[in-house]
Amino acid sequence: MNKKVILMILDGWGKSPDPKVSAIDNANVPFINSLYQNYPSAQLRTDGLNVGLPEGQMGNSEVGHMNLGAGRIVYQDLAKINLAVAHNTLAKEQVLVDAFTYAKENNKKVHFLGLVSDGGVHSHTSHLRGLIDATQEYGLDKVYVHAFTDGRDVDPKSGANYIQDLENHIANTPVKIASIIGRYYAMDRDKRWERIKLAYDLIVNGLGTPSRDAVASIKESYENNITDEFIAPVIMVDEHGKPLATIEEDDVVIFFNFRTDRGRELTEALSQQDFHEENMHKLNLYYVTLTNYDETYQNVKVVYNKDNITETLGEVLEKANKTQIRIAETEKYPHVTFFFSGGREIPFVGETRILRNSPKVATYDLQPEMSAFELKDALVPELNKGEVDFVCLNFANGDMVGHTGIMSAAILACEAVDACVKEVIEAALANDYTTIVIADHGNCETMINPDGSPNTAHTTNPVPIILVDKDIKTIHDGVLGDIAPTILELMGIEQPAAMTRHSLL
């Protein structure tokens, strides 16, 4: 075969066992429904060991795109660090040994920053517990946790329980919770520095609502209809109303999120550069991150560096002198570029990148179509030229609007995607492209939990694969790592040995 191929990723578009709770099943999506009638389809697994995560762990976009581009199962930081905690080797990692030794010898505070939940997308509470236990092995008594509440990868009001669990864990130690803030502020990734400033001012300047009871403060937020993701800054104080701890020059800071994208902005403000407009100034810190947030950072120590993934789909296409387009809106742009290329920032020879900005709204239920129509309008003319050999396209709506937990908005998101998919596939068929329609993980097919509360998290449901091609009549079930070999077979390019999964044709 010698086909031109489009990989169309409908982000967060899973297959629900219960249509009642599914935005997809409740939406009017006639075109995507017609694809199931007219073309071969099957299912892909995007969770747990199928994508290199711990068993039962829901997939996510970073992991999904990494597996898609790699053509193999890529073992993720979560699985790797879980093993280190379980086997008690975390405390023996040299970077942590050095940091704790420095703190001990210089009588400095150790601050842990990160997302306190077991969602396993950005962080895991077991890692924080392992790190805290390690500080106690070293006899450190000035240890503080700056907790970011989640409510997005886990239930919106689960934060009080996670903080209570953390308090139980540190009860008989000198370790203390120093501050609390929602991830919406501390973990922005859209250069909304006014959000990051709230987190910076909290942990550096002690600016927040003073509290002596962390769990009570979170529950108070719930009473005011503020869920975990959006909890306003809370600073923990002593009996004199003074902050228990703020981050000061020469302190040790350990950011324990293992996923890189939402740790970058706060790290930049704390350790890399001054933001004069926001009145944020970098401090001279002993700064440690669990994984490598950015190659260009100065004076940041990394506990677990990524193994380089070579011979990804992008690299194989470059070697075969094929052209490729990577196209997405801001929210998923790193996924179709950096993650799909196995952690590589630089475009391949013959690779064109098309970015459309995600709308600047507070939450995407306010604009559920996001920038899908702009993406479609940018891609269709490229397909009509018929020149590009491969396209990787991501529609973010099912995931990003699914995260709001608002069914009516997610339905509108699905309908917008359907309209855009129709135009792209019509152009694809007219210009002899084969389109593989898949998702990277589930989300908007389960908008309601069994207890009736909104579900804002990803799912472990299987996702569809539809092969839109005039000739091919069958496609098999598989995992995300099978997609790159499938694409190479369609394009008539030999699969490299490093791609250990297989084609689904």
Question: What would you call each of these model-derived segments?
Answer:
Residues M1-L505:
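Feature captures the catalytic ectodomains and active-site-proximal regions of enzymes
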